[in-house]
Amino acid sequence: MGDFCRRVDCKAMKFFALRSSIRTQIMASTTLLILALIGAIVTVWAKSESTLYHQEKLNDAKILSKVLSSTYANEVSEENWSQIRLNIDLLLRENEDFLYALVSDSNQKNQIAASSPDEFQNNYIPDIVSLSVTNAAINSSEKTHVVETFILRDIYFADKLRAKRGEKVMEVSSDIQTLSGRKLGKLRIGISLRKVNLAVTNAVNQALVVGFAGLNIGWICAYFLAQHLSDPVRRLQISVAKIAGGDLQHRADIHSRADEIGALATSVNEMSAALQISFNKLKKTLDSFERFVPNKFISVIAPQGIENIEVGAASTRRMTILFCDIRGYTSMSEAMEPIEIFRFLNDYLACMGKAIDEAGGFIDKYIGDAIMALFDDGNTDCALHAAILMQQALDKFNDERSMQTGKTGLPRISVGIGIHRGTVVMGTVGFTSRIDSTVIGDAVNVASRIEGLTKQYGCNILITESVVRNLSCPESFSLRLIDKSVKVKGKDEAISIYEVKA
């Protein structure tokens, strides 16, 4: 169960590691949202400001163009070009937004009769704007024609650079007419859009400042929101990791929230409680199973866990085998009722089993009243300790049995114990729906035969030469050679046997 929990814990931590945190997602989403809002606000603001300033500039230009056209009507009709030149020259000096002013004479095929700067005078087509702009201005049927274009070369006025090539300009053209409506000429004024562009740029900068402030405020709000949402999730993650690690008594402490996270924490706690109940049941089942198949046996035939046990799984080991049998059990059982035999055996086996457990061995199987126990190869001394403890426990069992029944005349129970060391095969037999564990090998048969010799030689505990040779502290036991050459059934070679004094 520990390996299973570690695998679950590892998978859970990998899962959480692959996911970006909620705090990061909220911060990133908020940032993108704020940036999108800032972009939209700046775009709308810039367009609005640009439209507003352009409209103001356009209205002012139209009014000025109409006023000047009306003013210049008399001068044009009287061909007072010098006065017109003075007026438009003064206009450019007073207002730097005006880049050029052109007055053409319809009687002279739209030749420019007055201009400022004066370099365009007497030209038909000025080279400061494209030909299409000039044609549109001259041929327009509108009283006031407005177009935005780019100047084609640098413009100087009063020996100073007034505009650079490529600068955007708004050209307003109006007809110069008599009161009767006869067309006398055309007034064209080029107005710089620098201030309009500067105003739009300032508006965009202001919007960016406001947006940046909003972004900072949004980040702060998003941080606290992310903190509010992610901290419970992080604590819940830690709780889940602890539960996955096997701490089924752990509970997520997020009861103060009444939202989905609180509901999730409640579900996790309910899951943990259910898992704890299930694992407790499983542990009881495994503990009960170990009473049928010892854990040491399972570790040999199913090292990867009992869930992976298969029919035919086997392992060869050198072990010390102990057999114990009640002498005269058949005649004794004939004088007892079946239920009395059942109770007697349980009491007796419990007494013997406790001694074996204390000595570090484990019981492989019960064969009627006989007990077969196993000890690891390095614990041969423990097998002898177990035999001695079993004899001592049996004496106590006999005394208690006599006291409980109140019949002091009951015969005392005696047992024979045989111990041998050798190679055995531990494994499973059966088929898929019914599996049993077993230990087989010549060493098992020899141990059983040695136990049978205890009655013949009148000894309680007999061991073989292989056991004596593998003792770590033989001086700790009282050993006596009984027979150095005895043949047991099923063995061709004679073996030596020793008595162990309890």
UniProtKB/Swiss-Prot annotation:
Q: What class of enzyme is it?
A: lyase
| Family matches, as CDD domains | CHD, HAMP
Substrates-to-products reaction catalysed: ATP = 3',5'-cyclic AMP + diphosphate
Domain HAMP, residue spans: 227-280
As for subcellular location, the record says: Cellular thylakoid membrane
User: For side Cytoplasmic, which residue ranges?
Assistant: 1-25, 227-502
The signal peptide, as residue positions, is: none
GO CC terms of this entry? plasma membrane-derived thylakoid membrane
Which keywords has UniProt assigned to this entry?
ATP-binding, cAMP biosynthesis, Lyase, Magnesium, Membrane, Metal-binding, Nucleotide-binding, Thylakoid, Transmembrane, Transmembrane helix
- Report the EC code(s) recorded for this entry: 4.6.1.1
Report the SMART domains cross-referenced here: CYCc, HAMP
Q: Which SUPFAM superfamilies match?
A: HAMP domain-like, Nucleotide cyclase
For membrane topology, the record states: Multi-pass membrane protein
Q: Which residues lie on this side of the membrane: Lumenal, thylakoid?
A: 47-203
Q: Which residues form the Guanylate cyclase domain?
A: 320-451
- Cofactor note, please? Binds 1 Mg(2+) ion per subunit.
Keyword Ion transport set for record: no
What terms describe the molecular function in GO for this protein? Answer: adenylate cyclase activity; ATP binding; metal ion binding
A Gene Ontology BP annotation from the UniProt entry: intracellular signal transduction
Domain note for this entry? The N-terminal half could sense signals such as pH or a change in membrane potential and regulates the catalytic activity of the C-terminal half.
Q: What does this protein do?
A: May function as a membrane-localized receptor protein.
State the similarity comment.
Belongs to the adenylyl cyclase class-3 family.
Tell me what this protein is called. Adenylate cyclase
Q: Which organism is it from?
A: Anabaena cylindrica
